[in-house]
């Protein structure tokens, strides 16, 4: 031991100082966000669509194609519009025969089923593209959480917050989907962080 510090303690002191430096912070943030993007892209590719996703995707396509927002009107349209944009741009088969805007109707589920029937096995890559389009919502949420925690409690707290955001199982499970959960969390963090200024 030299001056009361072991080799390991000196290493951690050195590593912590480098990690909390401006350059170390930027590299750490980028690395964590790239890791999360990779985890989400992998999960979005290998997991089958949930029961809700066909309805979300067809509602988003309806928003782009017709400028109408009756389908899935119980949630804000931004996440499904982002998810549907690459699918709508690439082109897909749609069947709007069961569309209705009658009070209390939830036609998005029937139309989602028709979407699956019309596209068959070709619908799987479409869901993957739609999910990939929503990955930036989680990355933005992680970045905003890092910034907010860093402003409130210091650089170390910002990195710990981003680390938790990157690997938190519930977030990873929902951020791979095109549902509005992760987008809501991310914009909620942004709004709360902006409110505190």
Listing of model-derived features with the role each one plays in the protein:
Residues 38-55, 69, 91-98:
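Helix-to-loop transition at the C-terminal end of transmembrane segments
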Residues 29-32, 130-134, 161, 180:
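Alpha-helical transmembrane segments of multi-pass integral membrane proteins
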Residues 132-152, 187-194:
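Transmembrane-helix motifs of polytopic, lipid-linked glycan transferases
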Residues 25-28, 97-113, 145-167:
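Transmembrane-helix signature of polytopic, membrane-embedded enzymes
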Residues 32-33, 161-166, 173, 193:
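Short helix- or helix-capping micro-motifs
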Residues 51, 176-183:
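Short acidic/glycine- and proline-prone juxtamembrane loop motifs at membrane-interface regions
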Residues 70-133:
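Interfacial juxtamembrane loops and adjacent helix segments
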Residues 1-23:
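Membrane-interfacial, low-structure loops and terminal tails that flank and connect transmembrane helices
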């Amino acid at each position: 031991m030299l001056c009361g510090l072991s080799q390991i303690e000196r290493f951690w002191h050195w590593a912590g100082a480098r990690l909390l430096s401006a350059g170390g912070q930027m590299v750490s943030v980028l690395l964590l966000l790239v890791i999360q993007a990779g985890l989400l892209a992998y999960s979005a590719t290998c997991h089958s669509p949930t029961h809700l996703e066909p309805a979300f995707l067809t509602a988003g396509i309806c928003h782009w194609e017709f400028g109408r927002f009756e389908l899935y009107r119980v949630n804000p349209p931004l996440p499904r519009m982002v998810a549907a944009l690459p699918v709508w741009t690439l082109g897909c088969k749609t069947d709007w025969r069961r569309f209705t805007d009658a009070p209390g109707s939830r036609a998005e589920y029937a139309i989602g089923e028709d979407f699956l029937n019309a596209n068959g096995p070709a619908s799987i890559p479409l869901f993957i593209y739609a999910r990939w389009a929503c990955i930036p919502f989680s990355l933005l949420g992680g970045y905003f959480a890092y910034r907010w925690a860093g402003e409130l409690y210091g650089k170390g707290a910002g990195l710990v917050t981003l680390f938790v955001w990157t690997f938190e199982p519930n977030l990873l499970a929902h951020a791979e989907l095109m549902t509005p959960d992760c987008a809501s969390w991310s914009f909620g963090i942004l709004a709360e962080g902006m409110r505190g200024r």
